[in-house]
């Protein structure tokens, strides 16, 4: 059975900011980008451990999927069968801020 995917406030803000930035030059590309990110993270709902453990945190429950140059960071909550999308982080920004 799939896990429910829940976007945190930070992750929603990250995605919104990225889509708005891209749409300044290319609205169609921005829409495609946003939908591709959502589709990619939905994979974590089907296969929660598909992503690698976030190396900076080294916690089994904290994973990431690459969407170059971004890191789609999520938490696995097995007890409630929920995957929380935590951040959409540009890899050039260094270590992700989890708060």
What role is predicted for each listed range?
Residues 67-70, 75-99:
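Enriched for short, Lys/Arg-rich terminal
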Residues 1-62, 78, 96:
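Basic, Lys/Arg-enriched alpha-helical interface segments
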């Amino acid at each position: 059975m799939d896990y429910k995917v829940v976007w945190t406030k930070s992750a929603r803000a990250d995605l919104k900011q990225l889509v708005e930035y891209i749409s300044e030059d290319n609205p169609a590309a921005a829409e495609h980008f946003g939908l591709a990110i959502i589709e990619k993270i939905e994979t974590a709902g089907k296969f929660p451990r598909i992503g690698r453990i976030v190396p900076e945190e080294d916690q089994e429950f904290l994973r990431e999927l690459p969407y170059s140059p971004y890191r789609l960071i999520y938490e696995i909550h097995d007890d409630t069968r929920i995957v929380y999308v935590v951040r959409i982080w540009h890899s050039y920004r260094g270590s992700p801020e989890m708060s």
